[in-house]
UniProtKB/Swiss-Prot annotation:
SMART domains: 53EXOc, HhH2
Pfam families (UniProt xref): 5_3_exonuc (PF01367), 5_3_exonuc_N (PF02739)
Protein name according to UniProt: 5'-3' exonuclease
Domain spans labelled 5'-3' exonuclease: 166-256
Native source organism of the sequence: Aquifex aeolicus (strain VF5)
Superkingdom, natural source: Bacteria
Functional note: 5'-3' exonuclease acting preferentially on double-stranded DNA.
GO MF term (any one): DNA binding
InterPro entries membership: 5-3_exonucl_a-hlix_arch_N, 5-3_exonuclease, 5-3_exonuclease_C_sf, DNA_polI_H3TH, FEN, HhH2, PIN-like_dom_sf
Keywords, alphabetical: DNA-binding, Exonuclease, Hydrolase, Nuclease
GO biological processes: DNA replication, Okazaki fragment processing
CDD domains xrefs: H3TH_53EXO, PIN_53EXO
EC number, as in UniProt: 3.1.11.-
Length: 289
């Protein structure tokens, strides 16, 4: 079975920046996010030897969720300038390395990942998603796994049930009930994880709660119907995206090795230069390009 590896690029970059101490070239250009991102990427390539790999980024344009709810993710701090300047460099390196990258204006990386996972799992691919984002757990199925790159935790259907008490397809219902402070998703006041699990055992889904709202509100007098409807719209991933991709589009291409090494030299990343030679020589010998 063919395997498609999907990396949540925005999350990788963000976490690399804050996980590592400040690093910069002798000219003062910041490099910690670049270094951390490439370390994780090269480690994945060495371990998994992927043939199909895509890195997905959030697009800079306003998203559909922000249009629905102006306060969505509003309390998240804006990316600092030393992080912002590193993102175009990471994208340039990916292109030089022959690794497909994808972003779609109006949609978050999560939505593009959801689209890819659904489309290519239906085509018979095994899909492995590398991201710490719990929203993506709604995609887990027999042929779709989510791996947290921070601790290598692998989420199968059984693992999702054990950790959250609900099946993967119920994760949006669960998150709509409990809310998400990080993303500013309101949820239902007074409903925590245990209560949400019990609610879903009784009602089955957010859709069914809304159909039986009077009964539900007698149990939870502080609940607001509009909050639940909004929360579900915010946590449910979009998969009906207007893009067409083939298997070939997601295949790792032959790298421009000279320019790639030149770029790493500019960034003064000597340790990664050695890895690049080793990784792409092995890939060439396996005739992946």
């Amino acid at each position: 079975m063919k395997t498609l590896y999907i990396l949540d690029g925005s999350s990788f970059v963000y976490r690399s920046f804050f996980a590592l101490p400040p690093l910069s070239t002798s000219k003062g250009f910041p490099t910690n996010a670049i270094y951390g991102f490439l370390r994780m990427l090269f480690s994945l390539i060495k371990k998994e030897r992927p043939q199909y790999l895509v890195v997905v980024f959030d697009a800079p344009a306003k998203t559909k969720r922000e249009k629905i709810y102006a306060d969505y993710k509003k309390q998240r701090p804006k990316a600092p300038d030393p992080l912002k300047v590193q993102i175009p460099v990471i994208k340039e390196i990916l292109k030089l390395a022959g690794i497909p990258l994808l972003e779609l204006p109006g949609y978050e990386a999560d939505d593009v990942i959801a689209y890819l996972a659904e489309k290519f799992s239906q085509k018979g691919f095994k899909v492995k998603i590398y991201s710490p984002d719990k929203d993506l757990l709604q995609l887990v199925s027999e042929n779709v796994l989510v791996i947290n790159p921070m601790n290598d935790e692998v989420f199968t259907k059984e693992r999702v049930i054990k950790k959250f008490g609900v099946e993967p397809q119920k994760i949006p219902d669960y998150l709509a009930l409990v809310g998400d402070k990080v993303d500013n998703v309101p949820g239902i006041e007074g409903v925590g994880p245990k209560t949400a699990i019990n609610i879903l055992k009784k009602y089955g889904s957010v859709e069914n709660i809304l159909k039986n709202w009077e009964k539900f509100q007698r149990e939870f007098p502080r609940a607001k119907k509009e909050d639940l409807e909004l929360s579900y719209k915010l946590v449910k991933l979009y998969t009906d995206l207007d893009i067409e991709l083939s298997e070939e589009d997601l295949k790792i291409k032959r790298p421009d090795l000279n320019k790639l090494k030149q770029k790493l030299q500019e960034l003064e990343m000597k340790s990664l230069l050695k890895e690049v030679d080793k990784i792409f020589r092995q890939a060439s010998q396996r005739s992946l390009f």
